[in-house]
């Protein structure tokens, strides 16, 4: 999906500071830079969810760790930054992954009113969510993800790193699963 090959390795290693599914000590650690308004990011994320489920069933929960990092491309996706802020504000209430899924599922509707509706649907404290949404600390967190992506050569989304090495293959289940399994050996 993304042919930028200027860097082949992840220069900001995974850490407990990231949004993590799984354990950092897993055999395979995937880091995806994504944009909530980008259909390719949504498709890539959904593909990774399917692969993670299949590999966890086959090899156990500790086999694969998935990390999502924000990379809103505001020049082409005007609502991507605010959607990322909504995800981080939801994270402040322990609901990052549910909001992440919701934003990707509804990426055509990311205006402010919808973001509040999604937060309400997830049972978030709406006054707190609205207060947290514009907080500079959340914006700084997103900017850190973007800066790390840029350092690692990311210019477009989605961008995927498998065990810190840039994945440049096809975003199809067979190819991606083969690359993940190969990285575990």
Indicate residue ranges for each PLM-predicted region.
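C-terminal cap of thioredoxin/glutaredoxin-like
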Residues: 5, 9-13, 32-35, 43-56, ...
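A short beta-strand-turn-helix
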Residues: 11-29
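Flexible, active-site-adjacent loop/turn segments at secondary-structure boundaries
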Residues: 18-19, 102, 165
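A structure-centric signal for secondary-structure junctions around beta-strands
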Residues: 25-27, 63, 83, 156-157
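Structural alpha/beta surface segment adjacent to cysteine/selenocysteine redox centers
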Residues: 31-120
């Amino acid at each position: 999906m993304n042919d930028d090959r200027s860097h082949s390795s992840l220069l900001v290693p995974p850490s407990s500071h990231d949004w993590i599914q799984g354990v950092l000590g897993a055999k395979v650690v995937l880091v995806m830079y994504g944009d909530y308004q980008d259909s390719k990011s949504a498709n890539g994320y959904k593909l990774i969810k399917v692969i993670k489920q299949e590999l966890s069933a086959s090899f156990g929960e500790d086999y694969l760790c998935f990390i999502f990092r924000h990379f809103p491309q505001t020049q082409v996706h005007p609502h991507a930054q605010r959607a990322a802020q909504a995800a981080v504000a939801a994270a402040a209430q322990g609901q990052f992954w549910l909001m992440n899924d919701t934003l990707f599922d509804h990426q055509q509707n990311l205006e402010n009113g919808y973001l509040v509706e999604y937060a309400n649907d997830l049972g978030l404290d709406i006054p707190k969510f609205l207060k947290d949404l514009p907080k500079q600390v959340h914006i700084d967190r997103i900017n850190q993800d973007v800066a790390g992506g840029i350092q690692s050569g990311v210019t477009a989304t989605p961008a995927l790193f498998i065990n810190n090495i840039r994945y440049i293959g096809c975003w199809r289940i067979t190819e991606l699963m083969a690359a993940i399994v190969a990285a575990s050996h």
